[in-house]
């Protein structure tokens, strides 16, 4: 990794607090069940609730397979656009993927994003899928290797990564309303 980038992406998104882990555990134990459940729900589309009693600020998430969207939908708030996950996987170059994902971490930090909702590790199962641009490959081993490099790159840059869509994320048609039968 280039030295200049290393300095930028290795700094944590939030400065370490120096809080002892025992203090964190004690604060979490002091929360009611309702407060704990609230920490798992969305405050809005792109953030989780703060819990001041536990010293937790609002947590911001964003989509990020090929660039960081951020909270705002404003064309003046641009983001670096990197190659799609499929293109990166085609290189089979884990070090390259890790470096590119460090750039995404930098973008996320610049936009105040704590966690990227990526990578998508669904496999390419059919050529008709409308979601392939988010996925790495039809090869499970390559997907695993590149997915790990993705997570290492993003989290090495001080931003969380959410591995998602393990299977059956293939449909673009009615994807917001499609529900699997029980």
What are these regions (language model features)?
Residues 1-182:
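Glycoside hydrolase catalytic-domain context in secreted enzymes
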């Amino acid at each position: 990794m280039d030295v200049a980038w290393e300095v930028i992406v290795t700094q944590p998104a939030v400065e370490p607090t120096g809080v002892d882990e025992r203090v964190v555990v004690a604060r979490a134990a002091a929360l009611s069940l309702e407060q704990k459940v609230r920490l798992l729900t969305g405050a809005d589309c792109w953030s989780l609730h703060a819990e001041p009693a536990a010293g937790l600020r609002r947590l911001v998430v964003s989509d990020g397979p090929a660039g960081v969207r951020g909270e705002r939908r404003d064309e003046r708030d641009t983001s670096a656009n990197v190659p799609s996950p499929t293109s990166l996987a085609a290189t089979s170059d884990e070090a390259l993927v890790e470096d590119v994902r460090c750039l995404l971490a930098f973008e996320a930090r610049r936009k105040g994003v704590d966690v990227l909702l990526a990578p998508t590790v669904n496999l390419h199962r059919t050529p008709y899928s409308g979601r392939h641009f988010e996925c790495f490959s039809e090869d499970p081993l390559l997907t695993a290797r590149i997915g790990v490099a993705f997570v290492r790159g993003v989290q090495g840059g001080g931003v969380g990564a959410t591995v998602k869509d393990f299977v059956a994320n293939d449909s673009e048609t009615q994807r917001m309303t499609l529900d699997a039968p029980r």
